[in-house]
Regions:
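PLP-dependent aminotransferase class I/II
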Residues: 48-53, 61-64, 125, 137-141, ...
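Conserved coil-to-alpha-helix start sites within the AMP-binding
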Residues: 95-100
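Phosphate-binding glycine-rich loop
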Residues: 41-88, 102-106, 112-114, 179
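Helix C-cap/helix->beta junction micro-motif
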Residues: 106, 159-160, 331
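N-terminal "arm"/small-domain region of PLP-dependent enzymes with the aminotransferase-like
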Residues: 1-41, 46, 242-245, 372
Length: 398
């Protein structure tokens, strides 16, 4: 006899909730923050440069610009790319809104390309089909941490004179064909929100190998103000002198955040390894269940997994995604959905976007659930998630 799920009156697999994501902090992290608090600089200090050097070391990129969050990173990347009024920026709808909003911030139009329905990343062929004479850049998201197909995307961008910006909010530590993702595209942005693999509380960064882009990114981060005499309109009045040479923003990261993030980055490989262990265990358990579908991983990507996406198979279930999601919640397994297609939002609808633009992305949205995945999960936690999925899938199987 099939075990009854908690939502149908059965007993939950556990009595306490498992978060879908959670920061993982230890004494070294606490000490790193305390050390900054006891120092002379809480912001605009030496920890920022130390962090930027650390990010360059990890990614292999020549330059890093630390900023206040991942959205700020995307914004200044678009500004540095020269994106403006009348331009178009191609991106995926299966992402957080910031990946498209960054184009709007610059007066440009986001254009949504469809996804590969196996990997869930942006489909290079769909990107190619959406290139017009107005296209200025492609913002490709490393969804769940898996690298986008960068070779194909770079080929398209070079063919049409476009810049490739990788939204690597999920993918710090990921490698594509053996090369860290932060050093491949023209610019790569990172996010360090608490549910990401490493965190600064809030924080972001832009990586590039291009010195001219780096100079622009640095300006846009700090009001468009510089103390570099080479960028000034005239000889400085003295050592105190600075000039605003462009319209920038206050997107600076604090030294407190940088200190925490440096400590977190020291554990990046540890975090990556544990997340991979959990993903492998999930894959092994779910691959043989016809009621659910496992995300395909490309062999070129050595992935730091930020999210674990479970896709339900409507042909094999008598419940839909919402009911499956709520059934997991009743088992005390807290899940999420990543993502609602960006152009579904009322703001985008007011701009003239309509459903039907990206059929594969829209179908994916109807069927996905993000399961718990973070370093601090115990083996028991992982087993409980697996048991809950198996119980629900079996009970509601067609």
């Amino acid at each position: 006899m099939l075990e009854k799920p908690a939502v149908a009156g059965g007993t939950p697999v556990r009595n306490t909730k498992i978060f879908y994501g959670h920061q993982c902090l230890d004494e070294a992290d606490y000490q790193a923050v305390l050390d900054v608090l006891k120092s002379d600089y809480l912001t605009c200090g030496p920890k920022i440069e130390e962090l930027e050097r650390k990010l360059c070391e990890i990614t292999g990129a020549r330059y890093a610009v630390a900023v206040s969050n991942g959205t700020a990173a995307l914004h200044i990347a678009c500004l540095a790319a020269g994106i403006g009024e009348g331009d178009e920026v191609i991106t995926t709808p299966i992402t957080f809104a910031a990946s498209a909003n960054c184009a709007l911030y610059c007066g440009a139009k986001p254009v949504f390309a469809d996804i590969n329905d196996k990997t869930y990343n942006i489909d290079p062929e769909s990107v190619r089909q959406h290139v017009t004479e107005r296209t200025k850049a492609v913002v490709a998201v490393d969804y769940t941490g898996q690298s986008a197909q960068l070779d194909e995307l770079l080929e398209i961008c070079r063919e049409h004179g476009l810049l490739l910006i990788t939204d690597g909010a999920h993918s710090i530590g990921t490698k594509y064909k053996g090369q860290p993702t932060g050093s491949i595209a023209d610019m790569t942005t990172f996010s360090f929100h608490p549910v990401k693999t490493v965190t600064a509380g809030e924080g972001g960064a832009v990586m590039t190998n291009d010195e001219a882009l780096y100079q622009k990114l640095s300006l846009f981060r700090t009001h468009g103000i510089t103390r570099n005499p080479a960028l000034m309109s005239r000889e400085p009045d003295g050592s105190w002198y600075y000039e605003q040479v462009d319209l920038g923003y206050n997107y600076r990261m604090t030294d407190i955040q940088a200190g925490l993030l440096i400590s977190q980055l020291n554990k990046l490989e540890l975090f990556k390894s544990r997340r991979r262990e959990i993903v492998n265990k999930y894959n092994a358990a779910f691959s043989g269940i016809p009621q659910v579908i496992v995300q395909e991983e490309i062999p070129e990507s050595d992935t730091t997994r930020h999210l674990y996406i479970l896709r339900i198979n409507p042909e094999k279930l008598c419940i839909d995604r919402k009911e499956f999601f709520e059934a997991l919640g009743a088992e005390n397994i807290c899940c999420n959905v990543h993502y609602i297609p960006v152009y579904y939002f009322p703001y985008y609808q007011k701009l003239g976007y309509e459903k039907g633009l990206c059929p594969k992305a829209e179908k994916l949205y109807e069927e996905i659930i993000s399961l718990p995945l973070y370093y601090g999960m115990s083996d028991r936690d992982v087993d409980d998630v697996i048991t809950a999925v198996q119980k629900i899938a079996a009970y509601y199987a067609k």
